[in-house]
C-alpha cells in the first residue's frame, strides 16, 4: 500500500481528531501475505507447493499487476508485533474460508535464529535468517462460506480461531467466511 496503514493515521485521513477513536480493530488474514521484497519468515515455513495451493485458494495476486503475492501460514510473532503497533483492542480475522480445503493448518508460533528461540519480533534483527517454529492444527476440510454464526462453524475452525486468540492475547471478534459483505461471523458482543 502506498499510504500509511497504521490505525493512528485513520483519523487524519478521515478528518477527525485521533482522541475520538474509542476502539481499534486489527484486521488480520487467517494466513500471512506479503507484497514486495524483504524478510518474510512465513514464506519458507511450508514450501512453494503449499504456498501455491494457498495463493490460488485465496486469489492472492496483485490487483493491478496480477503478480503472485508472497504467502505463508499465519505468523503469530509478526501479528503480535503488528497488533501492538496498532494499539488494537480486538481482531477481525479475514479469509478463514480459504483454509477450508486443508487437512492440517500450520501456524507460526515462534522464530529461531541460529537454533535459539527468538523471544519477540524485532524489525531490526536478522529477520531474513529466522526459521519459523510451526505448530500444526487439524483442518476442517469443509466449506464454511455460508456460515454467519459461530455455532455453524466446524469445531476445528473454532479451535483454530481460539488458538490464535490465545497466541495473540486478543479477542477475535469478527471472522469473515467469504468475500461478500454479509459473510462474516460476529463472535461475542459488538465492540
Task: Report each predicted region and the residues it spans.
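Non-transmembrane, aqueous-exposed alpha-helical and coiled segments at domain scale
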Residues: 1-191
Amino acid at each position: 500500500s502506498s499510504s500509511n496503514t497504521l490505525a493512528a493515521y485513520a483519523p487524519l485521513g478521515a478528518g477527525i481528531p485521533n482522541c475520538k477513536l474509542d476502539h481499534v480493530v486489527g484486521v488480520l488474514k487467517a494466513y500471512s501475505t506479503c507484497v514486495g521484497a524483504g524478510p518474510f519468515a512465513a514464506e519458507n515455513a511450508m514450501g512453494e507447493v503449499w504456498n501455491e495451493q494457498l495463493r490460488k485458494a485465496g486469489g492472492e495476486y496483485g490487483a493491478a499487476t496480477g503478480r503472485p503475492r508472497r504467502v505463508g501460514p499465519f505468523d503469530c510473532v509478526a501479528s503480535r508485533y503488528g497488533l501492538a503497533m496498532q494499539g488494537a483492542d480486538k481482531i477481525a480475522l479475514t479469509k478463514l474460508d480459504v483454509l477450508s480445503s486443508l487437512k492440517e493448518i500450520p501456524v507460526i508460533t515462534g522464530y529461531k535464529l541460529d537454533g535459539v528461540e527468538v523471544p519477540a519480533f524485532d524489525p531490526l534483527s536478522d529477520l531474513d535468517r529466522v526459521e519459523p517454529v510451526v505448530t500444526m492444527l487439524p483442518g476442517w476440510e469443509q466449506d464454511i462460506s455460508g456460515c454467519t454464526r459461530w455455532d455453524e462453524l466446524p469445531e476445528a475452525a473454532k479451535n483454530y480461531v481460539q488458538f490464535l486468540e490465545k497466541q495473540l492475547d486478543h479477542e477475535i471478534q469478527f471472522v469473515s467466511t467469504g468475500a461478500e459483505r454479509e459473510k462474516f461471523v460476529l463472535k461475542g458482543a459488538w465492540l
